[in-house]
Design a protein with these regions (language model features):
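N-terminal low-structure segments adjacent to metalloprotease catalytic domains
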Residues: 2-11, 19-54, 281-282
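Surface-exposed patches in mature extracellular/periplasmic domains of secreted proteins
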Residues: 89-109, 170-179, 200-206, 231-239
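Auxiliary, metal-adjacent structural segments of Zn-dependent hydrolase domains
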Residues: 25, 63-133
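Glycine-rich, acidic and aromatic/proline-enriched surface loops and short helix-turn segments
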Residues: 165, 189-197, 226, 230
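Pan-zinc metallopeptidase signature
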Residues: 217-282
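Short pre-active-site segment immediately N-terminal to the catalytic Zn-binding motif
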Residues: 134-155, 170-180
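Post-HExxH zinc-binding segment in Zn-dependent metallohydrolases
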Residues: 174-217
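Active-site recognition of the HExxH zinc-binding catalytic motif
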Residues: 153-166, 185-189
Length: 282
């Protein structure tokens, strides 16, 4: 990006931030944009925060255009990350008193990378990298709102991996049972969809299968949440504790009641959103 153009666009970004046009850190999913840097925490907010102890923000490319853009839009990364973490936990759990994995240390790393973002670590010590190259690309037309929206959406997904429960009794992520990968990645996108981190219908993948994970499951879960049970995402997350060994049919029956199964539910969803005809075989 041309340095002079970057300076001009960053100046615009800073003026935009100063006008209070960024999204409020204290917002609940679906709230309107406000000021990211000023938030009054409630007692319940602090209870959610107790599951995320220390954040180390590490900028490995401070001279890059992406880094400068990031800091112009997000001047207080610690407050920002904690706010998004609260959104994630509120979407996954009924209460801050639930069995929520504790994140003792989160290393959030801004660096030059061809990938967009990824979560690593475990057992309470988590690292998430976010690409400064991607930030610069998102800002290519001087679109601060796009950077803000994309950064929050990506963080919703990655922080879900830090706080979600994982299926028990069927092996690890990356093992022979693909259902583990399907649920873990699908749940992360379900949280992102439910929290307004995608662009609605235009980002919904058409057709496919719940076995395709990610947005396929994300939009599917959100449809069930909106049309059948507002706590569906929370219950599917909790099924990882209650359904052992975990299975798709067992989890759906746990969430919606006996007699429900994953294939019939997916078929109903596909018909409802117009991806298949009603007389198509499940």
């Amino acid at each position: 990006m041309n340095s002079k153009r970057t300076f001009i666009l960053l100046t615009v970004a800073l003026l935009w931030i100063g006008s209070g046009s960024a999204m409020a850190l204290g917002n609940r999913p679906g709230d309107q944009p406000g000021n990211r840097t000023q938030v009054r925490l409630t007692r319940k907010d602090r209870l959610w925060d107790s599951h995320l102890l220390k954040i180390n923000f590490i900028d490995k490319s401070p001279e890059s255009a992406g880094s400068k853009i990031y800091h112009a839009i997000i001047p207080d990364p610690d407050t920002y990350i904690r706010s998004v973490a609260r959104e994630v936990m509120r979407t996954l759990y009924f209460s801050p008193h639930d069995s929520i994995p504790e994140c003792k240390v989160l290393d959030y790393i801004l660096r030059s990378d061809k990938g967009i973002s990824a979560k690593g670590g475990g057992n309470g010590f988590v690292n998430i990298f976010y690409s400064s190259d991607w930030v610069a690309k998102s800002f290519s037309n001087g679109d601060t709102a796009r950077v803000d929206f994309e950064t929050r959406g990506v963080l919703l997904h990655e922080l879900t991996h830090a706080f979600q429960l994982e299926p028990q009794g069927i092996g690890p992520y990356g093992g022979p049972n693909k259902a583990v990968w399907e649920l873990i990645e699908g749940m992360a996108d379900a949280v992102r969809v439910a929290a307004g981190g995608f662009h609605g219908e235009q980002d919904r993948p058409k057709g496919g299968s719940y076995h395709d994970g990610y947005r396929y499951i994300g939009y599917f879960f959100d449809w069930v949440r909106r049309n059948k049970d507002k706590n569906f995402i929370r219950k599917m997350n909790k099924s990882c504790l209650e359904v052992v060994p975990w299975s798709w049919n067992g989890a759906v029956a746990y969430a919606l009641g006996p007699g429900h199964d994953i294939d019939a539910l997916w078929h109903e969803y596909q018909v409802a959103v117009g991806d298949i005809k009603a007389d198509a075989r499940p």
